[in-house]
């Protein structure tokens, strides 16, 4: 979901479990959310983009999942998609160094199987190449003087996982 307020863009997404879900799918959704928060925890002035990606990748792989490399987070502000690209994998201490005032999305896509995806003939729909499930969570993050602020949070944030 995106919001434009006074010319500034925001971007966020959540996963919702609908109906009765297998425990392995519930776990995928939970670990993906944890990957998002691991990435957010790495955000602070002086850190690097690679620190964010590494935190996400380590948590995903520790839980036997893979990180989609074909899609990434992005800078956001007066323009919806802008530089830098925020990879959800990487090596610590690499990439652009974070500075106070930067704003970007972190939106890891985590797969049960391999990291590979394919785009269907409609040019829009994407699925995993191996047919296994994938999950995604996203928040818009601002780098602050002392760390970060998740600007897509509100006091109205919905519970972590809702079963409809």
Give the location of each predicted region:
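Conserved small/polar residues in nucleotide/adenosyl-binding loops
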Residues: 153-160
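Histidine-centered active-site/metal-ligand motif
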Residues: 9, 74, 81, 139, ...
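Short, acidic (Asp/Glu-rich) active-site segment that either coordinates a divalent metal cofactor
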Residues: 1-40, 103-127, 135-145
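Short alpha-helix capping/helix-loop boundary micro-motifs
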Residues: 89-93
């Amino acid at each position: 979901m995106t919001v434009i307020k006074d010319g500034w863009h925001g971007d966020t997404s959540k996963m919702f479990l609908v109906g009765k879900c297998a425990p392995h799918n519930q776990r995928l959704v939970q670990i993906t959310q944890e990957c998002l928060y691991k990435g957010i925890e790495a955000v602070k002035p002086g850190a690097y983009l690679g620190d964010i990606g590494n935190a996400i990748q380590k948590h995903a792989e520790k839980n036997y999942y893979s990180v989609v490399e074909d899609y990434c987070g992005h800078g956001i502000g007066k323009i919806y998609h802008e530089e830098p690209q925020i990879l959800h994998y990487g090596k610590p201490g690499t990439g652009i160094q974070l500075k106070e005032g930067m704003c970007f999305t972190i939106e890891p896509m985590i797969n049960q199987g391999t990291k590979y995806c394919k785009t269907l003939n409609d040019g829009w729909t994407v699925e995993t190449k191996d047919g296994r499930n994938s999950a995604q969570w996203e928040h818009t993050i601002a780098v602050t003087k002392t760390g970060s602020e998740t600007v897509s949070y509100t006091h109205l944030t919905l519970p972590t996982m809702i079963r409809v």
